[in-house]
Amino acid sequence: VREVAKKGTVLVGFHEKRSSFIADMKSCEILPKRVSDLLVPLRELINSLSLRKKLPQIELAVTDEALALVLRVLEKLTADDEAKLRQFQKDYGVDFWYQPKGPDSIYPMDPENAARLKLHHRETGVEVVFRPTDFTQVNHRLNEVMVTRALRLLHLEPSSKVIDFFCGLGNFTLPLATRSAKVLGIEGSTELVDRARAGAKDNNLADKTEFEARNLFDWTLDDWDAVWNKLGGVDRVL
């Protein structure tokens, strides 16, 4: 996002090739159509805000049910600015999130919209709630295919005990748990582990899953022994 005084407007788009300039875009063929169709209204909205010079970036996340736009705001919004954002949110069916500092500082303008972004795995009925800045596969249908493929390749049985390394939010862990006796998800981030546990609870899989925060780049034979003893053996590893 950049205000261009000579053009009397705000540009919203990607950087030009090998440049810090923002491309003057009114549509984008590689974005979902409903996002592409928002480029012009979004430009008009931001151009009307008092903090348009303090809004350098927008991130987005899209699912079939929701479209979240994360505004990188460098100063507090005025009441008038927030009213305009709320009206835009209502008119175009988007969910605005604010990011005042680093990626972990994001929060939704309306708290009730915090759980609207979800990854679905229809075969197992698992839903994984994620935030707009979380790492997920950009193609959610392909993500679902990948999870299903993993279920097939692992040849899971009701007695299987599985370890899922770099489990993140439990995108694979939770579907695996629907076909196994126990799945241990291991992830480097304590925050992601906490959220994976919450996801297991939401999907009624807390009794079939465990999550641990560990530095997987320092994994040793002693760690293998520890998880082996904890699970009473390991049948599958992902």
Regions found by a protein language model. Give the residues of each.
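Secondary-structure transition/turn motif
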Residues: 14-18, 71-76
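Carbohydrate-binding surface patches
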Residues: 61, 66-74
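Extended interfacial segments that mediate partner engagement and assembly in macromolecular machines
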Residues: 1-51, 55
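Short small-residue beta-strand/loop micro-motif enriched in glycine and branched aliphatics
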Residues: 20-26, 67-70, 130
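Rossmann-like S-adenosyl-L-methionine
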Residues: 76-238
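Short strand-connecting beta-turns/loops that link adjacent beta-strands
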Residues: 5-8, 63-65, 124
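Peripheral terminal and linker regions in Fe-S/redox and tRNA-modifying enzymes
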Residues: 1, 41, 45-48, 66, ...
